[in-house]
Amino acid sequence: YNLALRSIAVVRQQERAAKEIAQVDSLPSKDVRHIGYFDITLPGLDGQEISLSDVANGHVTLLSFTSMDTDWSTAYQSQIASLYETYSPRGLRVYQVSFDTDSYVWKNRVVNQPWHNVRDKDGVYSSLIGLYNISSVPALFLINGDGDIVTRATSFDEVRGLLGRLL
């Protein structure tokens, strides 16, 4: 019963998002700034809202969807850290969305990370899963400085190759 209610809630969120997109499509083009991604605004560690558009504006950005409460999280975060250390001096930004429902686990795992970490408390019922067509986590997207999604990466080697060309 709860699963059905949550599924209905997710579908309704997706319908609302689709209506918002339709409204944006009807705006005069001079009032619209082109971006090739769905904007995300979620709370960070301090509770303040952080928007993907604020982080990515004019910068190459790695958009990461993940969960900290998994057996693979440590290795994954190590790979993100390696990319950040190598490419942030050249302008790379990282915006990481966690689908953890347990805020304690999430906060303890990201507290020392220097990039932008936000948490979607809806977990696997997040509307972002549908908007970004995420079938499993982790999921990586690379956004160029113009705001276009360059790739949905399947490996960190792919990301490194693209970052070498974009930065």
Enumerate the predicted regions with their spans.
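Oxidative protein folding and maturation machinery
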Residues: 1-50
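Short acidic-hydrophobic, aromatic-tinged amphipathic segments that line or gate anion-handling sites
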Residues: 43, 116-121, 153
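Generic structural signal for well-ordered beta-strand positions
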Residues: 50-51, 150
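Short active-site neighborhood of thiol/selenol oxidoreductases, capturing the structured segment around
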Residues: 51-80, 93-97
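Active-site acidic short loop of glycosyltransferases
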Residues: 57-58, 89, 134-137
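Structural microenvironment flanking redox-active thiols in thiol-disulfide oxidoreductases
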Residues: 74-111, 124-130
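Thiol/disulfide oxidoreductase modules built on the thioredoxin-like
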Residues: 124-166
